[in-house]
């Protein structure tokens, strides 16, 4: 399964992705995003960790306004 970086305040998303079998990495700094297939951020501050300027392999999903299920669906479609 995919390696997904998830901002630490999104614990429900972390748990749901782990239940689906993904490797979940908590994003505390820009370095945590390296090696991730996809990252999920809150969107409250679109560049809180510099991810917008970082060239990670995968896409960045903004969780703002989405349910946990919708976020998981986006992760599945992008990995």
UniProtKB/Swiss-Prot annotation:
<protein>
    <recommendedName>
        <fullName>UPF0180 protein BCB4264_A1446</fullName>
    </recommendedName>
</protein>
<dbReference type="InterPro" id="IPR005370">
    <property type="entry name" value="UPF0180"/>
</dbReference>
<comment type="similarity">
    <text>Belongs to the UPF0180 family.</text>
</comment>
<dbReference type="Pfam" id="PF03698">
    <property type="entry name" value="UPF0180"/>
</dbReference>
